[in-house]
């Protein structure tokens, strides 16, 4: 979509500490414009999931807290909002690992996403059909227990459940995790269509840098709790450092982190 420069989400220089002593995020700043897809990239332990949980206020269950900086949505501070209040404000997170209710059917899972809405049943059912139009496989499996569906179908169910809350912004954590490449492409194509057709903005945390930068408008790269690089997705895809460390390519050769020069070059990012 990307037709507006209006800032929906602003994360300004936040620090996150777990158990009062473990500093995980070290001055992270990022923004999400209305109608955009922004990718948050990096390896395991870089701070991607913690950043999303800081925004969605899910840190407290893991004894984490934002100790510095600010997070605003539509220029309003949201650090004190509960997750349910944040959903009512238009922001919802799809957790890493899908987290469907295994004993419920696919359709029952989807309908749980509408629990905060005040419209009547007719409008909710209309939106259910909208979700099915983007995820026809879910309609075919709507009476199946979610626990007996495939990983790809559970990821679709988790995204569809989030859409049932009528969000303006979706925080999507590791949508490609554990999925075959063909399913990853399918999921990201649907994200793109939702962005273009429904105007949903996405902030997605993803280790699959290649696919994320093909579908995103803008990207941030995290290393050890810091943003070390950011820019338009097309520019990041062509950046030599990104090619070397995240796409695994340098010229015509595939690079390894064990390469001494590569390691020293990488360390310079964090100085």
Can you annotate each of these PLM segments?
Residues 185-199:
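Helical segment within the ABC ATPase nucleotide-binding domain
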Residues 145-149, 153:
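Conserved ABC ATPase signature
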Residues 41-43:
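The feature captures the beta-strand-to-loop junction immediately N-terminal to the Walker
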Residues 248-271:
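ABC ATPase nucleotide-binding domains
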Residues 104, 149, 162-163:
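ABC ATPase signature
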Residues 58-59, 70-86, 116:
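ABC ATPase NBD Q-loop/coupling interface
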Residues 164-168:
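A short, proline-enriched helix->beta-strand linker immediately N-terminal to the Walker B motif
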